[in-house]
């Protein structure tokens, strides 16, 4: 849902992700049409969800139906994508995710990524959404202990390493996809690693100055890194109204390519069948009966008191005045209990706070529900992109007020100075892994509008050095200056002293590293963390004996502290950011729980 929608239209609006116009029309007309574009294969699905399939919109044969092309490719590559293209007018990303992951299977690694592109005037729905489930492999790291689960070979190994990020890197180095075959796929993430990197993964890089032994208390015991290797993904193209159902065949020599192709085709058929389920899963409609652009009530349950946070700000200012640092981001973690399911909260969040990086990620130990506005780092065809967002103002009630607040934001010396400082820090991070002279500031101090706030944004780019990979870029970027400070390492040392608990996923990153070597990692801001290991003896029943579990939701937010910061203002900024995110929980509870 576009953030530009008039607030008045949000009242009593039914969630529409359950029923598209094309599906609703089935109830109004008895006629239906089945389109089959895959030669030699008939469709035999129930009329409640008729199969609408095509290999390609164009008449040209795809790799799926061209075995000669596959045989030729197998001589020079060990990764081959096969896909089926289906019309998406009966299928939404939310429904596709629920087709692949059952409602009660909250421990199953899986993801749903969506996007709303920001603009100076309004936002628009991003072109692609991506869904994935059942990874072929998983890597889970806790400090220096790493567990690797190879689900295809049914093996599990455990080891202690200095840098767990080296494990997926070494596996990725063996990939050799055929560039011509990849060109047939949509310009989006189409398979590879997906997961999250916690803030504390910086300790793998800065072992001496930021050791785990000096880290704050780890009171949640969440993984520091979780990655799944997804051979199967579904990519929705919202412009062309179709979905690519993709499976990657990995040719490791254990099978002849003919057998690997046959197995891959059967796997693809099974994946398509899940999306054309005879009895599609039901998604509760829900009613949007809240003012979605309002902030929720302030959250009082924090890992620090108001006085403790303000005292930390005062100590940080002392270090700034002493010349130790220029700026630091101090955060606090709020806690809230809810009977709304995390997936229901995600459905609400995509209405309340649409952002460029919308994500629902089920990982080991936790579920992330995210609406991040900011890239942590992006690598595409050896071009590195860093987009600092710093400097924030609330949105106005109308266009005139928006313009006034935008002007005030760009004239605010404190906000602009902080932004320029972080742009310089971003240039430094990008410069560590780029070719000499290639770093550019392509955009400087533009305004981007989101549902509740507007930000000052800049874009820093550079060309990746020869011999380096996206994993080197990630190591150089984690964590970005907008969530740590400047100078970065010294600011993080002070964060260890001033914050009482480890940050975990907050201010780390989540996203994907594709089979092609591209990377798109979002900064874990505006991200709700639901630990899956937490159990409470507070189960109760609603009418119809529909049992619900009580979840604990963690909402963490920070404020940038500089020399002239006011401790009370910084505390209020943290509260306001968290309250805006908590609005999604309010909406989920009113729409799905309090019926």
Swiss-Prot record:
Catalytic activity: chorismate + L-glutamine = anthranilate + pyruvate + L-glutamate + H(+)
InterPro entries in UniProt: ADC_synthase, Anth_synth_I-like, Anth_synth_I_N, Anth_synth_I_PabB, Chorismate_C
Residues that, per the record, bind chorismate: 391-392, 506, 526, 558-560
Expression across tissues: Expressed in the central cylinder of mature primary root zones, including pericycle and early lateral root primordia, and vasculature of cotyledons.
Knockout mutant characteristics: No visible phenotype under normal growth conditions, but mutant plants are insensitive to inhibition of root elongation by ethylene, resistant to the herbicide and anthranilate analog 6-methylanthranilate, resistant to growth inhibition by the tryptophan analog alpha-methyltryptophan and insensitive to feedback inhibition by tryptophan.
Transit pept. (range): 1-54
Top class in the EC scheme: lyase
Residues at which Mg(2+) binds: 418, 573
KW Chloroplast (keyword) present: yes
Superkingdom, taxonomy of origin: Eukaryota
Pathway, per record: Amino-acid biosynthesis; L-tryptophan biosynthesis; L-tryptophan from chorismate: step 1/5
Binding site for L-tryptophan: 115, 356-358
Pfam families: Anth_synt_I_N, Chorismate_bind
One Gene Ontology molecular-function label: metal ion binding
Free-text cofactor note: Binds 1 Mg(2+) ion per subunit.
Major location (coarse): plastid
Cofactor(s) annotated in UniProt: Mg(2+)
Disulfide bond positions: none
Subcellular location: Plastid, Chloroplast
Record GO cellular component, one term: chloroplast
Modification N-acetylvaline occurs at: 55
Function per UniProt: Part of a heterotetrameric complex that catalyzes the two-step biosynthesis of anthranilate, an intermediate in the biosynthesis of L-tryptophan. In the first step, the glutamine-binding beta subunit of anthranilate synthase (AS) provides the glutamine amidotransferase activity which generates ammonia as a substrate that, along with chorismate, is used in the second step, catalyzed by the large alpha subunit of AS to produce anthranilate. Plays an important regulatory role in auxin production via the tryptophan-dependent biosynthetic pathway.
Family of the protein in this entry: Belongs to the anthranilate synthase component I family.
Protein name: Anthranilate synthase alpha subunit 1, chloroplastic
Biological source species: Arabidopsis thaliana (Mouse-ear cress)
